[in-house]
Design a protein with these regions (language model features):
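NTP/phosphate- and nucleic-acid-binding module
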Residues: 1-142
Length: 142
């Protein structure tokens, strides 16, 4: 039909797609591609990214992903530089990234990054699921 699923899907993708110029350390040609899917319809709700593969960060990140997987659609990515991993998740439309770093081992907090604003905040691991739920509930596109 003329109002079929394909047209609706294309409409969501076209509306969500954006190329943004990013201010980056003197590089005038730095762009990022973002799919601004609402968190409810994003294929991946949250990606868990260890800062490094060593020193137990990967194992800690996998534990956190297992916890988040109970409530959200998750992804785990440890390949490449953290900035490139953020960009891959932006392109996939993932609204939230959780970065596990050395402070995570020390104080039990993680970095929660927001796709649309690229803002990063520290969140206690014990409050992470609730914080993501709250962010989804209050989501407005920037």
């Amino acid at each position: 039909t003329s109002a079929g699923l394909t047209r609706n899907l294309l409409m969501f993708i076209c509306d969500a797609y954006e190329e943004q110029k990013v201010a980056d350390k003197g590089n005038d040609d730095d762009w990022r591609t973002v799919l601004h899917f609402h968190p409810v319809i994003a294929p991946i709700t949250v990606a868990v990214l260890p800062l490094m593969k060593k020193d137990g960060l990967a194992e800690l990140a996998q534990d956190i992903q297992a916890e988040l997987r109970e409530d959200f659609r998750t992804d785990y990515d440890q390949a490449g530089a953290i900035g490139k991993r953020y960009r891959r998740q932006d392109e996939a439309g993932t609204p939230f990234c959780v970065t596990v770093d050395y402070d995570s081992k020390e104080d039990g907090t993680v970095t929660l990054r927001f796709r649309d604003s690229m803002q990063q905040i520290r969140v206690p691991r014990s409050e992470l699921s609730n914080r993501i739920r709250t962010e989804i509930k209050n989501y407005t596109r920037v």
